[in-house]
Amino acid sequence: VYKRQIIYLSPRGRLLNYELSKSIAESNCNYILICGHYEGIDERIIEKYNVEEISIGDYVLTGGELASQVLCDSIIRLIPGAIDEGSLVEESHTNNLLEYPQYTKPDNFCGMVVPEILKSGNHEKIKEYRKQESIRITKKYRPDLLNNK
């Protein structure tokens, strides 16, 4: 039996993060998303139906439609079979670390080259390099994530 939960996308709601998306994706629940426009929705709806409020960040949008798309995308990708399971393991926020840098072709772009280790074929060394790069990137851009371990 499925239970039902109503979610209102609101700037005053609980901040959406990986853990919240994961718990929603793993729940045995049907969700109804409410998207306000301009001033929001009637407060009595929130009170009467025990509505959970979720925010996608500390800013205000004209309506909740874009926020609901962000919420849906963050949940759907965590549902088994939606994307390759191996892809989820190394993604940003999975272990409170941001993802390592990505490189594409050409090998040399404006004098900047792909690190040699990534072209070496040594999977163990590549794995270690990516882990160290994830730590470096997280320290640089989101050191707060390292304190949440």
Predicted regions and their residues:
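Short beta-strand segments
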Residues: 7-10, 33-35
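Short glycine-rich anion-binding loops that position phosphate/pyrophosphate groups of nucleotides
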Residues: 11-14, 37-39
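Short, small-residue-biased leader/transition segments that mark boundaries at the very start
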Residues: 1-2
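Structured adenosyl-cofactor binding patch, chiefly the S-adenosyl-L-methionine
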Residues: 41, 45-91
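Internal, active-site/partner-interface "lid" segment
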Residues: 66, 78-116
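Short glycine-cluster motifs
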Residues: 18-23
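Loop/turn-to-beta-strand initiation segments
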Residues: 28-32
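SAM-dependent methyltransferases
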Residues: 106-149
